[in-house]
From Swiss-Prot:
Pfam families linked: C2-set_2, Ig_3, V-set
Spans within the Extracellular topological domain: 31-344
Native species: Xenopus tropicalis
Organism lineage string: Eukaryota, Metazoa, Chordata, Craniata, Vertebrata
Membrane topology listed for this record: Single-pass type I membrane protein
Gene3D superfamilies reported in the protein's UniProt record: Immunoglobulins
The name this protein goes by in its record: Nectin-4
């Protein structure tokens, strides 16, 4: 220990010192020193280095000594904290170290102010106790040096050149910083790292192939470092020199004699901004014109002599480009067509045409429906007339057929009765009997069919039998017409169904049987009592 120890501590005999050292021998009880193994401090900030002793029962902390290990292995005292005499700071640390908890024997921590790079190293906290002796603990301190990044633009960028340096970003710190780029511009970058005794520097360069679209685009260098609470950014705006194509505008709407305020404009973008010159190829510029920037303005009304081919030349140090325009001046102002009015008029005309077409269509459809209705009525009337005529014909045919059949049956019956006695031959009698049975069966069949047809057609009104205004004599005359002899009896009855009802006036029904009404002309068939 240094000379200061003798001044601060009372004289201690060699016997007492040996006794203190033996107390921590195997089997003895010793305390524990608590501290951090490693700590970091940002350059220029304060850092607290803890050292706390957990004493056992009967132990007493006399003082705490802070030492820094040197490169040659020697320890250098920087602070001594005594429970009775206070703190002493040594050498270059004087004024930069203070006690963390003054007059607290158990807490031997110190605060190092305004940390600098030479403060990096290994520190030793030694606790002197009685009667246990000394206890040591080491602490590694690292000082972070945040970088101060810088960004430098490359040489001027010109459109059409090859790969060119756009910007370079450099940052130096401890430990080495990390550099990245943020941009919408397409390009490549290279990074180089350089080591220094107490720091490291990093340089990153960004390369592009210049185009006019890059002009004005941001290019940002992003620096990351443990000493930063957040990333740092440095932005550079790219400047690309170029000259765009030239065009003359302003005469497209048509110039005419007497037009006021006529102007021509020369459009040509570029970086730097180009300068403009005006001329007329077929002569000098007209009088009373003013050139202001990229505009050629006529200060008077136009005349026919102002026509010609005008030329504009733009230059900005990168190059020179020009363009021409032929200006024609009409004698009179061209009639302008109001597109809005034309559109509205067209819409109105189209609407009117559509309405007319709609009305005509409705009229034609209505007329067509009326014609169809009329034709349908005529058809119905025609069919009704034909139906009445067919009904009369069927009625006449049925009446005549019925009368003829009755007369034939009556005659056959009379002949059968008159010659019954003369026919003695059994075979002839048998044939006559069978013939009579067949006739009886035919008559009954005809009556049954007549009854069925009468029931089905009972709903037919009597008015259908004859036309309006037809006299009974006409009906009787039609009934006297002879039927078609080639038409079978059964078919006659079927064909004249609508007029059976009139003929059935001579019959009546009894227990499901059709019986003829008694009359003077009635005859009996086959002797069975059926009156026809």
């Amino acid at each position: 220990m240094g000379p200061l120890h003798g001044a601060l501590l009372p004289p201690i005999s060699v016997t007492v010192s040996l006794l203190i050292l033996l107390l921590c021998a195997p089997g003895g009880r010793c305390g524990v020193v608590h501290t951090e193994k490693s700590m970091t401090a940002v350059l220029g900030t304060d850092v607290t280095m803890p050292c706390y002793y957990q004493a056992e029962a009967g132990e007493k902390v006399a003082q705490v000594v802070w030492l820094k290990k040197g490169a040659n292995g020697q320890n250098m005292e920087i602070a001594l904290l005594n429970t009775e005499y206070g703190a002493n700071i040594f050498g270059a640390y004087e004024g930069r170290i203070k006690e963390k908890a003054p007059l607290d024997p158990a807490d031997g921590g110190i605060v190092l102010r305004n940390a600098v790079q030479p403060d990096e190293g290994t520190y030793l906290c030694r606790v002197n106790t009685f009667p246990a002796g000394n206890f040591d603990a080491e602490l590694e301190l690292k000082v972070l040096v945040p970088p101060l990044p810088t960004l430098g633009p490359g040489p001027p960028l010109t459109e059409g050149e090859g790969k060119s340096l756009a910007a370079s970003c450099t940052a130096e710190g401890n430990p080495a910083p990390t550099l990245t780029w943020e941009t919408d511009v397409e390009g490549t970058n290279t990074t180089q790292k350089y080591e220094h005794p107490r720091s490291s520097s990093v340089t990153s360069e960004f390369y592009v192939v210049p185009t006019r679209r890059m002009n004005g685009k941001p290019l940002t260098c992003v620096v990351s470092h443990p000493g930063f609470q957040q990333e740092k950014r440095i932005t550079h705006v790219l400047q690309v020199r170029y000259l765009a194509e030239v065009s003359v505008q302003g005469h497209e709407d048509g110039w005419f004699v007497g037009k006021e305020g006529a102007t021509l404009q020369c459009q040509a973008g570029g970086n730097p901004a180009p300068k403009y010159e005006w001329s007329r190829l077929n002569g000098s510029l007209p009088a009373e014109v003013r050139m202001e920037g990229n505009t050629l303005q006529f200060l008077r009304a136009l005349g026919a002599e102002d026509a010609g081919e005008y030329a504009c030349r733009a230059s900005n140090g990168i190059g020179t480009k020009s363009s021409t325009a032929i200006v024609s001046i009409a004698e009179h102002q061209a009639t302008k067509i109001d597109l809005v009015s034309v559109s509205l008029g067209s819409v109105g005309i189209l609407t009117a045409v559509l309405l007319v077409v709609l009305v005509i269509t409705l009229l034609l459809v209505n007329r067509h429906h009326k014609r169809q209705t009329k034709q349908l009525s005529e058809k119905i009337e025609e069919l009704s007339t034909l139906s009445r005529e067919a009904s009369r014909r069927r009625l006449n045919s049925t009446t005549a057929s019925t009368d003829t059949r009755l007369q034939l049956e009556e005659a056959m019956h009379l002949r059968s009765g008159m010659h019954c006695d003369s026919l003695r031959d059994p075979s002839i009698s048998s044939m006559m009997g069978e013939e009579a049975d067949r006739r009886s069966y035919s008559t009954l069949t005809t009556l049954k069919e007549t009854e069925t047809q009468t029931e089905l057609l009972s709903t037919v009104p009597d008015e259908e039998v004859k036309e309006d205004g037809e006299e009974p004599e006409q009906v009787e005359q039609s009934l006297e017409k002879e039927p078609n002899p080639t038409e079978p009896d059964g078919m006659v009855g079927v064909a004249n169904q609508p007029f059976i009802k009139q003929g059935m006036a001579h019959f009546y029904q009894e227990n499901g049987t059709l019986r003829a009404k008694p009359s003077a002309n009635g005859i009996y068939i086959n002797g069975r009592g059926h009156l026809v």
